[in-house]
Amino acid sequence: MYKNFFRYLISAIFLLGFSVNSNADFKVGFVYVGPTGDHGWTFQHHEGRNAVEAAGIKTTFVESVPEGADAERVIRQLAQSGHDLIFTTSFGYMDPTNKVAKDFPNVKFEHATGYKREHSNVSTYSARFYEGRTLLGHIAGKMTKTNTIGYIASFPIPEVIRGINA
């Protein structure tokens, strides 16, 4: 359902949000919470990164970065090394992203599934996962023999709450 979501997202950002003189001058960094071969969240971000790189834009990625101090260190290193745009691809990167963004006002930061945008150079993005969850909830409701269904949730973050409410 969201196979091409990240490709479209990244393409839209470049088409609508930035004007650059040369793709060679523009650098994009990605900070991944998991390995690129996970065939899930990180894999889809990595596919988007590959599409951006295929368009001639220089990219860098760091995979399997734990949330917390390590994330802040990696985000800061990417900003210091001249990246113009940095994608931080985990909810747990929200505070480190905002902390680093304060020190690098000329770098743009895109944070996945977060809600804090403490600086003008920080934006957030998410998919409409709740749409699929609405359909799954309807199907589960039709299948139940007890008129009871359940939902297993991880953390009370906006993305998860939207799924529960769907």
Language-model-detected regions and their locations in the chain:
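An alpha-beta-alpha
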Residues: 49, 135-166
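Periplasmic-binding protein-like
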Residues: 83-90, 110-112
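N-terminal signal peptide c-region/cleavage motif recognized by signal peptidases
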Residues: 17-21
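Extracytoplasmic "Venus flytrap"
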Residues: 29-52, 60-71, 91, 157-161
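Short, well-structured alpha-helical segments in soluble
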Residues: 68-82
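Flexible loop/hinge segments that line or gate small-molecule binding clefts
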Residues: 102-127
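Bacterial N-terminal signal peptides that target proteins for export
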Residues: 1-10
